Amino acid sequence: MKVDINAIKELRDLTGAGVGDCKDALTSCNGDIEKAKTYLREQGIAKAYKKSNKDVSDGLVAICIDGNKGAILEVNSETDFVARNEKFQKLVLNLAFLANQYEIENIEDFLKCEYSNNTNINDEIMSNIAVIGENIHLNKIGCLSVSSGVVCGYIHNPIVDNLGKVGAIVALESKCDVEKLKIFARQIAMHIVATKPEALSLGVLDQNIIDKERDIIKKQVEQLNKPASVLEKIIDGRMAKFYQEVVLMNQMFIMDSQFTVSELIKKKEEELGSSINIVDYKLFIINK
């Protein structure tokens, strides 16, 4: 039967279900809106959309690496109980795989992509909400790739392989031996998870972060009652320490504190006989 578009709109307004689901429900119920509402409830779709408005404070981070490209994403749930649910974990890993395949970081665009068997990703998430019984929210996606080099990742305290609460991926561009580069890249990813840098280099650190820290330090040193030129040197010294805390290239490497990350890269370049460039990294921490 042909379904009235106004009936679809009314049913969608009442239930929050998608256009396709509303059309199917009305078709199955011969256009009867009340019966269609019942149909959607029975199918769990209306329930899923209702739950999709609930707050989410837990979840999982997943990574998927394939040679010179990789993806990381964060999917939130309401509780840790669901985060440890096998069905939820499978969904998150599948989404990471698809993010790496599609190489799409925009959530809205990604949700429209095919999941499997003509089902899009958004519909699959809604289906899981209905079955699992908690809201599930795809929070963010990060994708990296290099033409020559590797992308590697690390998950801290994984629940299963490539799945946990904190993770990072990093892209290294180089023409050196791939296997040796992978080992180094994984060490960098582990370092990123441990130190949680705010930026790759000083040049890309948010100016607002710099200005805020400088203002805090300035207020601290004003009480020292020293000449302005001396105070400026003190401020510069403390800012240098701050950069060493928040800028990846300025940080002391956790596995060898004799070197900063920048110095370690130069050392590795000599060792492996090729230039190495950290193109970018992505660090995801649940609800941060």
Curated annotation (Swiss-Prot):
Taxonomic placement: Bacteria, Pseudomonadati, Pseudomonadota, Alphaproteobacteria, Rickettsiales
Family of the protein in this entry: Belongs to the EF-Ts family.
Domain of life: Bacteria
InterPro entries assigned to the protein according to its UniProt record, in alphabetical order: EF-Ts_dimer_sf, Transl_elong_EFTs/EF1B, Transl_elong_EFTs/EF1B_dimer, Transl_elong_Ts_CS, UBA-like_sf
Name under which the protein is recorded: Elongation factor Ts
Cystine residue pairs: none
Any GO CC annotation of this UniProt entry: cytoplasm
GO MF entries: translation elongation factor activity
Keywords associated with the record: Cytoplasm, Elongation factor, Protein biosynthesis
PROSITE patterns in alphabetical order: EF_TS_2
Source organism of this protein record: Ehrlichia ruminantium (strain Gardel)
Function according to Swiss-Prot or TrEMBL: Associates with the EF-Tu.GDP complex and induces the exchange of GDP to GTP. It remains bound to the aminoacyl-tRNA.EF-Tu.GTP complex up to the GTP hydrolysis stage on the ribosome.
Cellular localisation: Cytoplasm
Chain segments carrying region Involved in Mg(2+) ion dislocation from EF-Tu: 79-82
